[in-house]
Amino acid sequence: MKKVILFTYVIIFLVFLSGYSVVTKNIVHNIKNNYKNNVCSMKVMHLWFKIINLFSKKYNVDKKLITAIICVESSGNTHAVSISKAIGLMQIKPFSAGREVYRFRGLLNQPSDVDLYDPKINIDIGTSYINILRNKILSGIKNSEILLYATIISYAHGASKLLKSFSYNKTLAIKKINKMKIKEFLDYIHNKYSEKKAWDYLSKVMYVYHLV
């Protein structure tokens, strides 16, 4: 019963935020499928809660967001590897997100594949990357909700790609985003953004986020 109530709440939440013209039958159908197929088992996710809490506090990142991203990215499988060579719980690409985190830490090179199969290292780097996206790369975005959505999209598809869809000038891109209301930003992601998978990814993450 509790799950049904939560599921209903999430649907209403997404409809409210996105506007009835934005949340199509297909999107709602996808969310229902996520609910029906149980995106990931909380019994599996429970294995990582202690580590999630540790790095949530270290990087000041919402533990619900970390949990949701792990759930959507890997279903809590430490051995998950994508076609694009993303590795582990938070599906870190060593040559992109991994290297970016190393750069901000003043380190050379990138994490090894072996490192990224380690749950603690993987969640450390993944959560650090979320922090970098939110507090460094996207820091000029004023609305906290839009910043959350932009961070989630950037985690999966890159901040540079998102910002360049508004302008190749980062300052101008952020100014354009800051002129948008929440519904306008979500409508842009759903209907105009060139990365068509971004909306589906955002929907999945927010779905789990509100169930955790």
UniProtKB/Swiss-Prot annotation:
InterPro entries: Lysozyme-like_dom_sf, Transglycosylase_SLT_dom_1. Keywords: Cell wall biogenesis/degradation, Lyase. One of its GO terms (biological process) is cell wall organization. It is an enzyme of class 4 (lyase). Its EC number is 4.2.2.n1. It catalyses: Exolytic cleavage of the (1->4)-beta-glycosidic linkage between N-acetylmuramic acid (MurNAc) and N-acetylglucosamine (GlcNAc) residues in peptidoglycan, from either the reducing or the non-reducing ends of the peptidoglycan chains, with concomitant formation of a 1,6-anhydrobond in the MurNAc residue. GO terms for molecular function: lyase activity. Murein-degrading enzyme. May play a role in recycling of muropeptides during cell elongation and/or cell division. Belongs to the transglycosylase Slt family. PANTHER family: ENDO-TYPE MEMBRANE-BOUND LYTIC MUREIN TRANSGLYCOSYLASE A, SOLUBLE LYTIC MUREIN TRANSGLYCOSYLASE-RELATED. This is Membrane-bound lytic murein transglycosylase E. The gene is mltE.
